[in-house]
Amino acid sequence: MTDETVSLDAALAGDEAALEELLARVQDDVFNLALRMLGTVPDAEDATQEVLIKAITRLSSFRRESSFSTWVYRIALNHLATYRKGLFARFPVSFDIYSEDIVSSRERDVPDLSGSVDRDLLARELKLSCMNGMLQCLDAEGRSAFVLGTMFKLDSRVAADALGITPEAYRKRLSRARARMAEFLSTYCSAAGSDACRCERRIDYAIATKRIDPVRLDWQSLKRVEEAPDGERIGEPASESSAHAGDVETRTDAMERLDDAAGLFASLPRYRCPDGAASFIKDLIASGDFKQAVGDRPERSARPWTCKEH
């Protein structure tokens, strides 16, 4: 019997500590998935709470046909694909909108708005904001495939299971999304070799258009996932060779662009679930009102977490 099975059985029997342990194993992944799917820190934090609540209230419906984390991914992806409260749901973006904004050169007319904040710090904030915003230019299907394959590096079978599609369909979605992202990056982004757009040049324009706030650096305030024992950061490529496998000299230009795009996004930091979201869930589990809402029963009754999935 695995530790996961033991924790699941205990959680279903009403053990709050076991339920907290289960959620602690997946909450960072849920938050990072929400970040990439929604594009802003506040929206990701709110959505993470909602996804974890769904996982709690649907726990009794988990058939254990996949790992607990894959099951939670499925809940998260379904929730995030239809999330309508976020910034980018209200103000959609596209690669055409991004490119028009870049070629307009509007940043040239904006004065220095950085104040006393270090401009290198602001440039890093803008890069993170821009790249996560860029993901929103992909449709929900392409974005989910791109995030799972490029950033989470899930096996195609696991990713397909989480998305509820075949591995073949998943690979096609991933390939299309990677090609579209690579095309845009190679044309416009300095990180991919183009001089059309550089974060350093667009800091003041980003402040003026409220892309970043110099007094509230959301991305810089997040805590990164700890490093693995060998010194590599968990969730990032172990080395240049593993991130870009294959003989560089024999690859086509198209494949190089795909690998460059994948490498840029794969190297983005992975973050801890914010304390506010984690504490909210912990307090909710311990709440008498919440237990009653999800079907808590008298002490001798088993399986209190039995709210049916709708």
Regions found by a protein language model. Name each.
Residues 1-9, 21, 88-144, 154-167, ...:
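Intrinsic, short, N-terminal disordered tails of RNA polymerase sigma-factor systems
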Residues 23-41, 58, 84, 131, ...:
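Amphipathic, Lys/Arg- and hydrophobic-enriched alpha-helical face
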Residues 9-31:
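A short, charge-rich alpha-helical start-of-domain segment used by transcription regulators
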Residues 44, 55, 170, 174-177:
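Helix-turn-helix DNA-binding helix
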Residues 32, 46-53, 57, 66-78:
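Structural recognition of an alpha-helix C-terminal capping motif at a helix-to-coil junction
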Residues 12-13, 37-40, 50-67, 86-89:
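Sigma70-family region 2
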Residues 27, 31, 52, 80, ...:
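C-terminal flanking helix
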